Amino acid sequence: MSRSSKKGPFVDPKVFFKVQKAAETGSKEPIKTWARSCTIVPEFVNVTFMVHNGRQHIKVLVTEDMVGHKLGEFAPTRTFKGHGGKGKR
């Protein structure tokens, strides 16, 4: 079930404040965050985030196509090792 439209998108206030501060100073340094549930808003475009995946931080450069998605969608948490095959028997 999706979030109620009357509530609007969830944006972590700390992340939003850091993006605004970086825009004012013109900083291009990545913003480190653990807020995977934060929705990407248009103010985040062309900002680099370091999103935590449970083990390390993954670098994510936000583009216009990502607006409306969550930051955590672009930092996978599970490593796919592949299905069984001839080499795994």
From Swiss-Prot:
This protein's record includes keyword Ribosomal protein: yes
Biological processes per GO annotation: ribosomal small subunit assembly; translation
Classification via PROSITE patterns: RIBOSOMAL_S19
Keywords: Ribonucleoprotein, Ribosomal protein, RNA-binding, rRNA-binding
SUPFAM superfamilies, A to Z: Ribosomal protein S19
Listed name of the protein: Small ribosomal subunit protein uS19
Any one annotated GO CC term: small ribosomal subunit
GO MF, one example: structural constituent of ribosome
The organism of origin for this protein: Rhodopirellula baltica (strain DSM 10527 / NCIMB 13988 / SH1)
Ribonucleoprotein is among the record's keywords: yes
Pfam family, one: Ribosomal_S19
Record function comment: Protein S19 forms a complex with S13 that binds strongly to the 16S ribosomal RNA.
Similarity annotation: Belongs to the universal ribosomal protein uS19 family.
InterPro entries: Ribosomal_uS19, Ribosomal_uS19_bac-type, Ribosomal_uS19_CS, Ribosomal_uS19_SF
